[in-house]
């Protein structure tokens, strides 16, 4: 192993000089071996500047780092623990435990920079993944081994939706999950850990956190650390769920690193390599003939603008998009999923079946018609509408309310127990509303219930 010395430190960017014959490769991990507070700090090589000097990004705080400190080349990229030992543990970007529960005790380590599976290895079968959340199962169904994006501005419920998905899927499908917290709030990471512990699924989840307060290098690489752990489970023949909260912070960390490295920014100040960086991550999240990775990614939408380069680049990689709307959230309807804006490649009669497809289409048509009639109602009132339109409005309002649902993870705040609704019950309920079976039931009865039977029961009680 070659050793070098630190020649320049600018925040998270550290330049290290090595002998000309032993210059580290790009993405190699370097370790600070000199004395002081930074002993053990890991640096990742980003550029070779010539003359034996490499430019690196620090994977931790560079406080106390000074010129002349000795640095050792590890000879490979950052390697993290993988396999069963990671389940139930919280780790940082380097795979070091941060939950004070002793060493990980892993049997194997993988480097975080790996090639995506080749075309021949990839699987092409389609199978639906039931989530138990009515609006998602109906309008934007998830595929096993697919990629799903949860789009939403600040405070419309991305994290709560993601927590509910983890809770439902871990309980109903008893699958393994990897949760990568990329640049999110430490409080949420803490809540998530205790929630998983309380619901008894902690031994099925591996958690990797690179929170908001950490340097950009950590936030940029933590998604790859989580993905590497998920890949190991997939290669063992398991079906894994990879949750990334939040993919926008991954882009943002890339922007910070890019600026620190002195690259010219592109549109809206993003890094010029935005599409390539996103592609490197997304292409690895795929299913092979051995096992599957189903990924759910929360995507923060800056200023609710879906045309911003970051969400727009993410859109291209996804099979299903769940768009959370501030307008729906303001009506008190949670989950605040917009059924007219959310899409899924799986919503095809050949995949979901003709009945499901027709009901989903019917729901969207009724809601779209109601949206068009809203202006007329606002100006002239309900009385000016034809009988058919009055019927459409009445059913649309019932559908809107029936799309809401109490969540298990929100029980603490709402006091109402969470509901898991099987897909067949979801289809039966919406089909009944569309066909006028429940025209006699008041719309309030459909608010915050599980299956349609609960709505009827609620109405009868009144």
From Swiss-Prot:
InterPro entries: AAA+_ATPase (IPR003593), ATP-synt_VA_C (IPR055190), ATP_synth_F1_bsu (IPR005722), ATPase_a/bsu_AS (IPR020003), ATPase_alpha/beta_chains (IPR050053), ATPase_F1/V1/A1_a/bsu_N (IPR004100), ATPase_F1/V1/A1_a/bsu_N_sf (IPR036121), ATPase_F1/V1/A1_a/bsu_nucl-bd (IPR000194)
Protein name, entry field: ATP synthase subunit beta
Role played: Produces ATP from ADP in the presence of a proton gradient across the membrane. The catalytic sites are hosted primarily by the beta subunits.
UniProt gene name: atpD
Subcellular location: Cell inner membrane
Complex formation: F-type ATPases have 2 components, CF(1) - the catalytic core - and CF(0) - the membrane proton channel. CF(1) has five subunits: alpha(3), beta(3), gamma(1), delta(1), epsilon(1). CF(0) has three main subunits: a(1), b(2) and c(9-12). The alpha and beta chains form an alternating ring which encloses part of the gamma chain. CF(1) is attached to CF(0) by a central stalk formed by the gamma and epsilon chains, while a peripheral stalk is formed by the delta and b chains.
GO cellular component terms attached to this protein's record: plasma membrane; proton-transporting ATP synthase complex
NCBIfam families: atpD (TIGR01039)
Alphabetical list of Pfam families matching this protein: ATP-synt_ab (PF00006), ATP-synt_ab_N (PF02874), ATP-synt_VA_C (PF22919)
GO molecular function: ATP binding; ATP hydrolysis activity; proton-transporting ATP synthase activity, rotational mechanism
Family in the record: Belongs to the ATPase alpha/beta chains family.
Reactions accelerated catalytically: ATP + H2O + 4 H(+)(in) = ADP + phosphate + 5 H(+)(out)
Major enzyme class: translocase
Membrane topology: Peripheral membrane protein
EC assignment: 7.1.2.2
Keywords: ATP synthesis, ATP-binding, Cell inner membrane, Cell membrane, CF(1), Hydrogen ion transport, Ion transport, Membrane, Nucleotide-binding, Translocase, Transport
Signal peptide feature range: none
UniProt binding sites for ATP: 152-159
Coiled-coil region: none
């Amino acid at each position: 192993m070659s050793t070098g010395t630190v020649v320049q430190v600018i925040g998270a960017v550290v330049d290290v000089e090595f002998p000309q014959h032993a210059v580290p490769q790009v993405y190699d991990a370097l370790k600070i071996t000199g004395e002081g507070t930074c002993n053990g700090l890991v640096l990742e090589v980003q550029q070779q500047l010539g003359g034996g000097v490499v430019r690196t990004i620090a994977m931790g705080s560079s406080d106390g780092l000074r010129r002349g400190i000795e640095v050792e080349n590890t000879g490979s990229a950052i390697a993290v623990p993988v396999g069963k030992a990671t389940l139930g543990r919280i780790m940082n970007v380097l795979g070091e435990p941060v939950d004070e529960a002793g060493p990980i005790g892993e049997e194997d380590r993988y480097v975080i920079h790996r090639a995506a599976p080749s075309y021949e290895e990839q699987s092409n079968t389609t199978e639906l993944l039931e989530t138990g959340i009515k609006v998602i199962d109906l309008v934007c169904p998830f595929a096993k081994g697919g990629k799903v994006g949860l789009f939403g501005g600040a405070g419309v419920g991305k994290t709560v939706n993601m927590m509910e998905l983890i809770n439902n899927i871990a309980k109903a499908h008893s699958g393994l999950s990897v949760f990568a917290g990329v640049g999110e709030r430490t409080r949420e990471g803490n809540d998530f850990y205790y929630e998983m512990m309380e619901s008894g699924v902690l031994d099925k989840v591996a958690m990797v956190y690179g929170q908001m307060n950490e340097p950009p290098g950590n936030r940029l690489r933590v998604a790859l650390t989580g993905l590497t752990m998920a890949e190991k489970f997939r290669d063992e023949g398991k079906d894994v769920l990879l949750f990334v909260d939040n993919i926008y912070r991954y882009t943002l960390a890339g922007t910070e690193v890019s600026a620190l490295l002195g690259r010219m920014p592109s549109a809206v100040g993003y890094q010029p390599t935005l599409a390539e960086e996103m592609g490197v991550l997304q292409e690895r999240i795929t299913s092979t003939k051995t096992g599957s990775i189903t990924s759910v990614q929360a995507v923060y939408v800056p200023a609710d603008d879906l045309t911003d380069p970051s969400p727009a680049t993410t859109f291209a990689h996804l099979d299903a998009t769940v768009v959370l709307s501030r307008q729906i959230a303001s009506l008190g309807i949670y989950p605040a999923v917009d059924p007219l804006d959310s899409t899924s490649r799986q919503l095809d009669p050949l995949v979901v079946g003709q009945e499901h497809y027709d009901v989903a289409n019917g729901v969207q048509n009724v809601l779209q018609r109601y949206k068009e009639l809203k202006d007329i109602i606002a100006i002239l009132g309900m009385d000016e509408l034809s009988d058919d339109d009055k019927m459409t409005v009445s059913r649309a309002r019932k559908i809107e309310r029936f799309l809401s649902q109490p969540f298990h993870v929100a029980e603490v705040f709402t006091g109402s127990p969470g509901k898991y609704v099987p897909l067949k019950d979801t289809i039966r309920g919406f089909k009944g509303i569309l066909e006028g079976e429940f025209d006699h039931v008041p719309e309030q009865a459909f608010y915050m219930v599980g299956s349609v039977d609960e709505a009827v029961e609620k109405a009868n009680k009144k």
